[in-house]
Structure formats: C-alpha cells, structure tokens
C-alpha cells in the first residue's frame, strides 16, 4: 500500500515490455478462469479476454513495426511485430470461430426507410438503444458496461450527451463532424463520394446545390449506418418530454425550435444550438419514452464482434497480405451498411485505410 507520493516518486520506470507482459498475463489468467459464455448481463466470458488480449498484441505489433513517435525511447523490432501480429490474429480467430457468436441481426442491413422519415430505420440503429440492443442478438456485444435505468441512480447519461433539447431537454454535448460524413460510402459503387461542401443556410441555394451539406439529396444511396448514426437537414427524430413521446421533429440546421410545414403538416424543429457542421446524432438516442435523459439502461459496448472481425483482418493482412477469409469478414461488416463487397482491385487499398473508415 502506498500512502504518500514520496514513497514512489523516485522509483525507476519498469521497461514497457515488462508492463505489456504483465497485462498479457492478466488477460491469459482471465481467459483460463472465465466461462465460455456468461449467464449474467455485463459479466465477461472467455471471448472478452481473448479479444482484449488480441487487441493488446495488435497495438504491440503496430508499435514494433511502425514505431511510436510519442515515446522516443521505444525501439521497434520487426521480428517482434511479426510475432505479435500472428498472435493477435490467432486470438481473434478463436473469438470468431469457437463461441457461436454472430453479428447483431445476422449482420443484415434491414430497411433504410425513406428520406426525411424515421418510422423505419436500419438495423444498425437498433443495436445502440436498450429496448432492442440489450438483448445482444447473436452475441455481438462481447464486452459492455451495464446501466441500471430508472430509479437506480446508475442510469446512463448518453441521451443527455448525444441528444438535443428535443429529447428530454438534453444538452447535445457532441455532434458529428463533416469529415465523418465524408467517410460513408456509396451503396451503389462501394466507393467514396465527392466531399460535401458546407454552406450557409441563408444562401438560397444551400439546400439544393449539388454536394451541399444542407441538401438532403447529398445523402441518398449512402452506407445505411449513416442514417442510423446521424441526422442531416429534414431528417426526423422522436421528440421526448417528461418520459413520453411527443411526436417527430425535423432537424433543420440553425432553425432551432422554429415552425415549418412539411407535406402539409406543421412541425416544431429540433431544438439545439450546438450543431457545428449541420448534423446531430441519432445513434444512442432512444426513440421511445419511459426514462429521463440520465436514466437509460443502455449496455454500452466496449468491444464487439465486428471490431474483432476488422482487427483480425488487419493483423492477418500484416503477416499474410489480403486473404479470402479476412476479406469475407470485412465484407460481412460492410454488408450491414448495404455496401457492395470489396472487389480485388480495392482490397489492398481497403486494408491500408481501414482504421479511418467507420466500417464496424
């Protein structure tokens, strides 16, 4: 037990490799002791220990291959990198194959619905709200944090952070950036689309100009996960007040709480002044009543099967190059966004840029 900083301030730092091995041994111990499958929500099982051990090895391999600029005393070791990439891939493959896990709703994209309507949303949205996501269909959530919900004093605050005033007077503490929008690919070609252009809402052409960030048509035929994740101009979301549904509201950039008529019906627009680039989140915001902004019972994902698919592909690619097994895993993740599978000419480029694409 340490009682004062003076007891440790002059201790020399342990070598990073020694620290890494200690963490590895903890994950291995957990793997040996945990059950194959937990019967209690929020408790870890063997797949979680393997997934975290593999992730640590993937980091270690990457530092040893590509260096660690922030740590000038770290010396990369190519042989250590190759060994760690192989070990990471092995751990990830066991998670994928040995425990009967599957993607949420079998990785199917579901229906996109229609522009400016939220009655129907892609399957991806439903993985991140408690009423449907907490059931953990297929076991995709390998490790997650539970929350108590109403009356527990341990509810989740995610609606407060992600939602606006239209959802239980939430605070919209974070909003999507335009650079995220530009990562969502075309469902027709599988390629990136021309980057959207920010425009002032007062410009008379702002909502009709080609590739304008405020033109809803700029978002037609994009990765289904975009609609599941965010709102752009004229997209609808359920308004919530006093734990009750109060009807759909349209998001219109810089028109906060105004009156608009859409298809002959009057609406009050989404209320927030926090949006910077013209978007707000849909992901993690409940579309039903029953709980306040800090009273959610969301199972917050820490590591998911889709994450493991992509980490396996990265690790195996570093050792063996693009392989059919890894490409199939990547395409299973892409399918949930209704994206076409990778073709041979795009495979190498995909693996190079995987980490900056919201593929999972």
Residue ranges with predicted function:
Residues 1-171, 190-360:
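Acidic/polar-rich alpha-helix caps and helix-coil junctions
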């Amino acid at each position: 037990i340490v009682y004062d900083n003076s007891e440790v301030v002059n201790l020399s730092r342990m070598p990073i490799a020694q620290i890494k091995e200690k963490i590895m041994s903890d994950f291995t111990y957990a793997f040996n002791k945990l059950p194959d499958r937990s019967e209690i929500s929020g408790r870890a099982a063997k797949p979680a220990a393997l997934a975290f051990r593999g992730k640590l090895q993937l980091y270690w391999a990457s530092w040893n291959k590509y260096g660690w600029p922030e740590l000038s005393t770290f010396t990369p070791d190519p042989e250590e990198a190759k060994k760690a990439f192989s070990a990471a891939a092995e751990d990830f493959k066991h998670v994928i194959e040995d425990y009967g896990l599957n993607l949420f709703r079998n990785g199917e994209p579901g229906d996109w619905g229609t522009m400016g309507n939220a009655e129907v949303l892609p399957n991806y949205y439903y993985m991140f709200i408690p009423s449907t996501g907490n059931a953990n269909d297929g076991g995709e959530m390998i490790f997650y944090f539970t929350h108590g919900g109403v009356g527990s004093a341990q509810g989740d605050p995610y609606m407060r952070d992600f939602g606006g005033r239209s959802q239980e007077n939430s605070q919209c503490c974070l909003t999507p950036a335009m650079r995220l929008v530009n990562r969502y690919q075309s469902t027709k070609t599988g390629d990136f689309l021309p980057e959207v252009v920010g425009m002032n809402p007062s410009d008379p052409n702002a909502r009709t100009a080609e590739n304008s960030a405020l033109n809803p048509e700029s978002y037609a035929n994009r990765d289904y996960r975009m609609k599941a994740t965010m709102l752009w101009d004229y997209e609808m979301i359920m308004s919530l007040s006093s734990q009750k549904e109060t009807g759909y509201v349209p998001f219109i950039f810089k028109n906060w709480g105004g009156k608009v008529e859409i298809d002959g019906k009057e609406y009050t627009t989404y209320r927030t002044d926090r949006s910077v680039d013209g978007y707000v989140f849909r992901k993690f915001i409940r579309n039903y009543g029953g709980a306040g902004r800090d009273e959610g019972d969301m199972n917050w994902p820490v590591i998911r099967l889709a994450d493991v698919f992509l980490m396996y592909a990265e690790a195996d690619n570093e050792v063996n190059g693009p392989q059919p097994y890894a490409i199939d895993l990547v395409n299973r993740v892409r399918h949930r966004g209704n994206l076409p599978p990778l073709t041979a000419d795009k495979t190498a480029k995909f693996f190079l840029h995987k980490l900056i694409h919201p593929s999972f």
